[in-house]
């Protein structure tokens, strides 16, 4: 970007997060500088401070870190709740990985991740819980405004667009992947 005009190298902050096929993978790709900061200065010291490290304690620390991550964005319960939802989602992801020795089909795991992330972003962007519930209820047709939305031509066009976006997102490289092959960009992770 424009920082390169002044020979300033900024760390990569996003790496196609909507290509993620798990919530763990999403946070490895999304807001990478914040995730790194939280890992280095909150998660790791919290784990090191434990006398006995257990899976349950580590999962509780993950939840705590993501609540802090939420409040890092602003002093609002909505941000804290967003962090709680992501912390709980990560815990479920870790428990699933620990208990089951198989992976879901890529498209299914991508769809679950994409849906979960976007539903939780509603809590991040709305002013209060009532507004968040209203948005969600309108999305799923749980009120008079959304009645019959699943039978309209627009609904099927939307589904087609989502499928096209998934294909583009999955098959094509992002700008960093495209331009990193040029010598000027090498080593600028």
Residue ranges and their predicted role:
Residues 1-165, 169-189:
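Membrane-embedded transmembrane alpha-helical bundles that form the catalytic cores
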């Amino acid at each position: 970007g424009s920082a390169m005009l002044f020979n300033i190298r900024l760390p990569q902050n996003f790496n196609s997060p909507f290509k993620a096929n798990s919530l763990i993978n999403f946070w490895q790709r999304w807001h990478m500088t914040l995730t790194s900061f939280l890992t280095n200065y909150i998660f790791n010291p919290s784990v090191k401070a434990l006398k006995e490290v257990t899976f349950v304690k580590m999962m509780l620390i993950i939840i705590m870190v993501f609540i802090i991550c939420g409040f890092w964005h602003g002093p609002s319960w909505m941000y804290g709740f967003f962090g709680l939802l992501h912390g709980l989602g990560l815990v479920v992801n870790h428990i699933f990985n620990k208990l089951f020795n198989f992976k879901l089909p890529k498209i299914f795991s991508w769809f679950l991740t994409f849906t979960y992330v976007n539903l939780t972003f509603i809590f991040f962007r709305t002013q209060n819980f009532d507004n968040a519930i209203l948005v969600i209820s309108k999305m799923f047709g749980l009120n008079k405004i959304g009645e019959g939305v699943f039978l309209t031509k627009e609904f099927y066009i939307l589904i087609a667009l989502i499928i096209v976006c998934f294909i583009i997102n999955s098959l094509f490289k992002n700008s960093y992947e495209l331009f990193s092959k040029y010598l000027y960009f090498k080593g600028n992770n």
